[in-house]
């Protein structure tokens, strides 16, 4: 390997290289997956582009997503061109499919990186992939016995960290986040709408004051509730956080998420070759709502099947917005309180009668 030969040209350079490799952590992150092995879901990393580039180049570099899904993951307009510029040092969410195996989550056989002249595994891990992965993890994933021996044009699977675990029983999308200079867990949690205690527990952090720059955190982002069936091929892939959108069912369905409702909003895309979308109860089109307030129902996307031909499924969904759920919970709690007060009052009356 040319880079290794150059590095070992002098004893001093060889010693420096050895120190760098020994100092590198064996694991960039410890993302656990408690779900069944083989489970897949949507995850992402928050990538910082070291140089000026374009969205099209990022799609090609990571090869884990399409341009429409990359734009959706970052809340950018649908019509944004692949040539649109990405400034140096700006951050972009890169979505990918996560697969859980043996209590560990890693990107599902992608991205694939082709070794270039002068490349080394540590440089690939740090400079190309923001140190979301270590050279040891790349070597292990590709069955490379000697990390110093890789060849130009060799293809490498880069195992990015991820998870498909739920958080307190709710679906989330796990974002791999690299801690910036001077950042703390409280500010990071507030930025992404999670509690600091959740962030600390998820990342097994006992002392938040010891957070280090470049440390990789698992940030479980809240996602919109959906009506997608567990039997649908995309039931774990449409995990959309606030302000994002995505395409599914052969790009025939577009779904978006907003924190105003936290309820997945899906509409049909009028693409050539897309099948007709069934009405709900014979009257409501996909995305249409009947009624108002917490008693309203919406024709929701519930998945697709594609055994012989693409079939899109819909179903009626009740209003599951946060406001309505809180209202229902509040009313139930109020009713229980009133019942308790009635029982207490009744017993007080009996006690008073006994003393008369």
Curated annotation (Swiss-Prot):
Tissue: Expressed in seedlings, roots, shoots, stems and flowers.
Disulfide cross-links: 33-100, 41-164, 98-162, 100-164, 224-257, 252-274
Glycosylation site residues: 30, 63, 89, 151, 184, 265, 281, 290, 306, 319
Post-translational modification comment from the UniProt entry: N-glycosylated.
Single GO MF descriptor: chitin binding
Keywords: Cell membrane, Chitin-binding, Disulfide bond, Glycoprotein, Membrane, Plant defense, Repeat, Signal, Transmembrane, Transmembrane helix
GO terms under biological process: defense response
SUPFAM superfamilies linked: LysM domain
Start and end residues of each LysM domain: 111-158, 175-219
Inducers of expression: By chitin oligosaccharide elicitor.
Signal peptide: 1-28
One Gene Ontology cellular component: plasma membrane
Predominant localisation class: membrane
Topology within the bilayer: Single-pass membrane protein
Transmembrane feature ranges: 336-356
CDD domains per the UniProt record, alphabetical: LysM (cd00118)
Role, per record: Chitin elicitor-binding protein involved in the perception and transduction of chitin oligosaccharide elicitor signal for defense responses.
Listed name of the protein: Chitin elicitor-binding protein
